Amino acid sequence: MPSLAPDCPLLAMPEETQEDSVAPMMPSQRSRGPLAPNHVHEVCLHQVESISDLHSGAGTLRPYLTEEARPWDELLGVLPPSLCAQAGCSPVYRRGGFLLLLALLVLTCLVLALLAVYLSVLQSESLRILAHTLRTQEETLLKLRLASLSQLRRLNSSEAQAPS
């Protein structure tokens, strides 16, 4: 279980949070082996009045947000070492690998944007062709109706002239 930092005041949790966080252990959970070590060494809970306090640093968070910016290696150190060992990377290649992944992500986004534009143009072109086809069919149907009415009139007039 992570330890609380010595400079973090222990805050009382609301009843709803306590109910959610305290759950009885199931028998299957007790029989599990030891959990993998967590890379979070300290947990520091700070009371905030609203979500905007987290972004602006206002309110009771002000003393805790004055820490210096963390170096790049410390930020990348959040990844478990076992993950880097499996991938075969060393701390020297972390930043380069991260930048390579970032470049790959940007390139993928550009390709997807181009594909979206291409599909949009293709869709508008096919809709234009479909509209033209429907107009042509509508004109043909109108011509067939006129021809049918003309034939019906001729038939009616020839029956009226025929002697019975």
Swiss-Prot record:
Record's bilayer topology term: Single-pass membrane protein
Entry keyword annotation includes Lipid metabolism: no
Cellular component GO terms held in the UniProt record: membrane
InterPro entries the record matches: DUF4714 (IPR031674)
Main location: membrane
Subcellular locations according to the entry: Membrane
Protein name in the entry: Leucine-rich single-pass membrane protein 2
